[in-house]
């Protein structure tokens, strides 16, 4: 059992007797109230999706499934293909990746964990930190140094990350895949 606050994208939880893949998590904390966790879920058996809201301390039944270390191989619309050390290939539907699809690029060497349910690859968990190149961002605004200045940047793979003002096109940055936050320039 995990609390709702500990659930991450790629985890598989049991709700109402069915396994659900967590595609996205969003935590909201307010001053006096407890944290609220909003989960975007996809049913493994029925391919239906839903959003559920939980209190941060709610207990959820995390299913322990078979996991295998794999690397990304190629994209065969609408499937992402991953390969293990023995060159076995596993297809994962693009819908099951959720936000992780923004960080997957051709030639990436990051080792991912592919999760299986009844022999079918259902989700992928990326490493906690990955390095990607900034392919587009606005130039820094000269003189705007009051506090922590952030701006949007597009990274290889097509995702958008909010980065510090000093980051420019061509820089390699480290990203926390759990939250999608910029960590540092590499």
UniProtKB/Swiss-Prot annotation:
Family as reported in the entry's similarity comment: Belongs to the elongation factor P family.
Predominant subcellular localization, coarse grouping: cytoplasm
GO annotation, cellular component aspect: cytoplasm
Pathway(s) annotated for this protein in UniProt: Protein biosynthesis; polypeptide chain elongation
Record-linked InterPro entries: Elong-fact-P_C, NA-bd_OB-fold, Rib_uL2_dom2, Transl_elong_fac_P/YeiP, Transl_elong_KOW-like, Transl_elong_P/YeiP_cen, Transl_elongation_fac_P, Translation_prot_SH3-like_sf
GO molecular function term, any single one: translation elongation factor activity
Keyword terms of this UniProt record: Cytoplasm, Elongation factor, Protein biosynthesis
SUPFAM superfamilies found in the cross-reference section: Nucleic acid-binding proteins, Translation proteins SH3-like domain
Protein's name according to its UniProt entry: Elongation factor P
